[in-house]
Structure formats: structure tokens, C-alpha cells
């Protein structure tokens, strides 16, 4: 198959000309080993999603972690409807897990709890039932706005002290904005 330059989303090395995505960010594995939560921000079309998909696959294949790249973008239309945003985000995360993780590392069906705590509850349940430490990369988190963005950030902060047994060992917010910009964007 002839390869080509891709400018429309994640690259596939079998189809597209690309640099090794994981070699571009060697410090990330160290952050994960240190149970860090971190932000990866860069302009559009610079390889963030490609790199994080490749890193998640490599970490999972190593046998040491259950690592996945998920997206928060489906929650973007709901600036103040936390319940709807959470439900759509969790549905997208379940689909991503089904397509990217082996059956033995799939999350449980996310239990329904009250709005404002669904994401934390799902991540907690997933970490507690996972046979390996859970690593989650949340792409497009900066697509969220208003009350929804604040709710997501508060839930992640609330779960942080419970890692790695009851919350992801390591978590990355991936997008175009630095974390300092999130509160401003939330209003």
C-alpha cells in the first residue's frame, strides 16, 4: 500500500508517513510510573491524539497497565447540562474501551449515579475492578465549557487522592489549552 501524508486526524503508520509518536514524548512513561496527572497541550494537528493512542496501546501491550485514550468532545454541546454531558461522555468511553482494549481489560458497565459524580464513579469502579493499574488519556477535554468543564475537573481532582487502587494511576488531559486556561474557559 502506498503511504501518504495525513492532515485529517490520527495517523496510522501503516497508511501514513509519520514520526514515531511515542519517541517524541519519552518523558510521559516516567510521569505514568510516578502516578502523575498531567496536561498535554499543543496546537491542532501536531500529533497529540496519534501519540496518545500509540502510547496507550504500547502501555497496554506491555502487560503493566490498562491504558486507554478516550474523548470528552461529545460533551461539548452541553455547557450547563452536566447530566447529559456525563451520559454521552461515558457512552463514548465505553465504545472506545470495547474497540481498543482486550476483553479482560474492559471496564464494567458504568453504574448510574447522580449527575456531577458519574465520571468519578465510573473511573473509580473501573480502577477497582481492573487487573492492572488504569491509565487514562482524556482527549479534547478543552472542548467542554461552563458548568460541565468545572464538574469534570472537580471530579478528577476529587478522585486523585484515591489513586491507584480506586482511581486511575495516571491521567492526562489532552487538548489545545494549558490547564491554567481551563478555569478561565469555564467562566
Regions found by a protein language model. Give the residues of each.
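The start of beta-strands in P-loop NTPase/AAA+ ATPase cores
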Residues: 36, 66, 134-135
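Alpha-helical scaffold elements adjacent to nucleotide-binding pockets in ATP/GTP-utilizing enzyme cores
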Residues: 50-55, 84-92, 151-155, 159
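Conserved Walker B catalytic segment
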Residues: 114-178, 185-186
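Active-site catalytic microenvironments for nucleophilic, acid-base chemistry
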Residues: 58, 96, 162
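Switch/connector loops and helix/strand junctions flanking conserved nucleotide-binding motifs
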Residues: 76-80, 179-184
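Conserved NTP-binding/hydrolysis module of P-loop NTPases
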Residues: 79-103
Amino acid at each position: 500500500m502506498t503511504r501518504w501524508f495525513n492532515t485529517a486526524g490520527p495517523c496510522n503508520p501503516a497508511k501514513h508517513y509519520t514520526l514515531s509518536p511515542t519517541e517524541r514524548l519519552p518523558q510521559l512513561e516516567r510521569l505514568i510510573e510516578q502516578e502523575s496527572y498531567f496536561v498535554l497541550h499543543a496546537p491542532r494537528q501536531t500529533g497529540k491524539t496519534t501519540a496518545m493512542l500509540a502510547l496507550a496501546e504500547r502501555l497496554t501491550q506491555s502487560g503493566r497497565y490498562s491504558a486507554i485514550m478516550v474523548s470528552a468532545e461529545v460533551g461539548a454541546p452541553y455547557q450547563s447540562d452536566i447530566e447529559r454531558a456525563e451520559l454521552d461522555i461515558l457512552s463514548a468511553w465505553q465504545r472506545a474501551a470495547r474497540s481498543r482494549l482486550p476483553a479482560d481489560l474492559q471496564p464494567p458497565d458504568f453504574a448510574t449515579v447522580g449527575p456531577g459524580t458519574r465520571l468519578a464513579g465510573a473511573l473509580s469502579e473501573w480502577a477497582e475492578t481492573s487487573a492492572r493499574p488504569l491509565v487514562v488519556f482524556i482527549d479534547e477535554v478543552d472542548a467542554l465549557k461552563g458548568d460541565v468543564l468545572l464538574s469534570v475537573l472537580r471530579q478528577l481532582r476529587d478522585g486523585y487522592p484515591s489513586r491507584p487502587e480506586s482511581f486511575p494511576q495516571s491521567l492526562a488531559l489532552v487538548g489545545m489549552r494549558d490547564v491554567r486556561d481551563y478555569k478561565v474557559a469555564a467562566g
